[in-house]
Amino acid sequence: IIGTALAIAMIMVIVITLRATIAPFAPETHRDRMLIFRFAGLQSKSNVNWQSNGPIGYNTAKACFKAMTIPEAVSITNIWQETMLAAKPAGEMESCSVLQTDDAFWKIFEFEFLSGKPYDNADFDAGAAKAVISEDMARRLFGTSEVVGKTFLLNHSAYIVCGVVRPVSKLAKYAYAQVWIPLSSTSAFTATWGDDNIMGMTAVYILAKSKDDFPAIRQEADRLRAIFMAGHPNFDLLYRGQPDTYFVAAQRYSANNPPAVKEAVRQYILTLLVLLIVPAVNLSGLTLSRMRKRISEIGVRKAFGAPRRELMMQVLSENMLYSLFGGILGLVLSYVAAFLLGGMLFSVDFVSNGGEDLRTMCVDLLFDPTVFLLAFLACFLLNLLSAAIPAWRVTRTNIVDAINER
């Protein structure tokens, strides 16, 4: 039972971790239709040894991606969330995570608005000092979630709350924040670096109408890049295979290194195989040992005419019960592990948001009966095979040898 439980628990933890990387959940509901562009390389045409790597500027992103016609929506945001200080009405300061976005951000990511609405295109073009805040941040700042129309200070700049959304899990790493403000209301809107002001601090998120449009979207992105770079004849802008699908983007850890996609897939497959095969071998040995202790009982039953098939079915039915109890225990253990080891498993810090972030994570990712049933089925089949082989060997033992435990 313990062997089955540990196998199922470990498999579920691995699958939950993988699901957090690729499976859609609010507000990143459309992960399967998303393409992501976060880093580029700027290569000098006159000096092959000169190259800059990193995010691109807003104007570059706008010229190379906003003009696209094939996608459903294109959003430009600050590439990373920033930690800022929000001032309560009484003057106390509260640290919060802030993401600067455009208005199309709210079309790509599906937030649950509890009150108010997001800032729109007119607000973005005007650089309006409006903010969408999470429910938990609203309570921390104002003591209530009914805060639409109220003003607070964000890094000493006044912002008006235009909407309140349900808290977001940090596992939604591209949509997560506690406060969302227009990119055009901050200096990040015009921030650039490098030659010709091509590089900056923005990321691009593209929502395709269908996954089948991905090749056409990449071709259109290359065409727009060529048009933009015609005005910068001294440089090449390197996309390095981007925009990426969500899974590939999760494996891209730096601007100038390719994502290790094959290695990641190979690692997941190898881990799952080890988690399945090792317990199966152990269970086979345990079953054979248990059967040898009952060999005299089997010999007596065979002497009284018990058919081999009946003895086999008894052993297999007992193993089914072990698998069932082990599966239930494994399910419980996997949830306990996800709660206790969440920060390590998902590479996020749950301390700042406490149980609220764990709750939003668990509702969307942990309690999925399909994942459990698949893991349980895999372990059950292996347990069945691991029990069938020793049972077949023992039931073929000669009656006299079985009674004499030989």
Predicted segment positions?
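A hydrophobic alpha-helix feature that marks transmembrane segments and, especially
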Residues: T271-I298, L311, L385, P390
